Amino acid sequence: LDHVLGNIQSLMLAKKAGVDCRILDAYNRIRIIDGETILKKKEQYGTYVSLIPLTTEVAGVELTGFKYPLTNYTFTSTGSASLGVSNEITENIAEICMKSGTFVLIESRDEPLKA
């Protein structure tokens, strides 16, 4: 777990430097997002999409094209982090928008990616 958290902090450093960096394994694709992010169902890495607040607050969150949509919701790192776990894309295009803050975006699958 210590290496995972350290690597997520490395993703944040890359994001601040303007570098699009991701952690990838057979089950997960992880990146840092802010502002607006579009996910295409046909390009999704796995079945599930999780959003974990990386900042104290992620405000004005809009989720469209998901099983559990949200409108103008505020995530906090101490109170609502589990609300963003294991959502699913239901439309061809899913959109994540936020007015402020930063998420760790985790796309995950139950079965490993086959080479």
Give the role of each language-model region.
Residues 1-40:
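Anionic-ligand-binding alpha/beta catalytic cores of soluble enzymes and soluble regulatory domains
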Residues 26-28, 33-115:
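Long, charged alpha-helical interface segments
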